[in-house]
From Swiss-Prot:
The modification Phosphoserine is found at S216, S237, S239. Its main location: cytoplasm. Residues 182-192 have a biased composition (Acidic residues). Pfam families: Mlf1IP. One of its GO terms (cellular component) is glutamatergic synapse. Keywords: Cytoplasm, Nucleus, Phosphoprotein. Residues 154-169 have a biased composition (Basic residues). Belongs to the MLF family. InterPro entries: Myeloid_leukemia_factor. This is Myeloid leukemia factor 2. It comes from Mus musculus. It is found in: Cytoplasm; Nucleus. Residues 134-144, 170-179, 193-225 have a biased composition (Basic and acidic residues). Residues 122-247 are annotated as: Disordered.
Amino acid sequence: MFRFMRDVEPEDPMFLMDPFAIHRQHMSRMLSGGFGYSPFLSITDGNMPATRPASRRMQAGAVSPFGMLGMSGGFMDMFGMMNDMIGNMEHMAAGGNCQTFSSSTVISYSNTGDGAPKVYQETSEMRSAPGGIRETRRTVRDSDSGLEQMSIGHHIRDRAHILQRSRNHRTGDQEERQDYINLDESEAAAFDDEWRRETSRYRQQRPLEFRRHEASVGGGRRAEGPPRLAIQGPEDSPSRQSRRYDW
């Protein structure tokens, strides 16, 4: 335990296994003056950690138990971890030869004791596939204002069709909005068909065991396929009852 509390050398194997060693070393440089940017770096004897190659620091982060999660900076740098994760997702998506999925959720809770607790929740998801195909989803629930909102966007490179629906369970107000990016409203149906054709190539097949079980339960007859998700129009709008917006 005492060994971990002192500043060890980067070559020490214990340094590589201690997730807080890099943080302590950084603090030591800051307290020694100059915040790690000494004007005399060029004439040091080479023992100063800041003058060593970056590969040594990268190696230490890689061996650290939390290094791969972006937590090697000490105290579990959550913002750094999120930035690294988003950067890795964008890098993989830009490669054009993989499918990616990312999701983030923010929840705020407060209870002052003079009423019902206030909860705010926001979730964002993104799925991507080769060819610049993306699906974005965003949901918001705010107990204070009574707002519930959901938006789904389909993207093909720089074109997008975004459908957003919201309601207020306190006032009963409902709203629907459609946004088009580099599209005309008359091109929306053709764009949706193109998006479904492109995404159908990447749908996962169900396991063989599941198909066998389904066939045995259904007397040898299988369903034509899993049900498609859909957002249907409001029931109080007769003009939209026959409309089906498949996602």
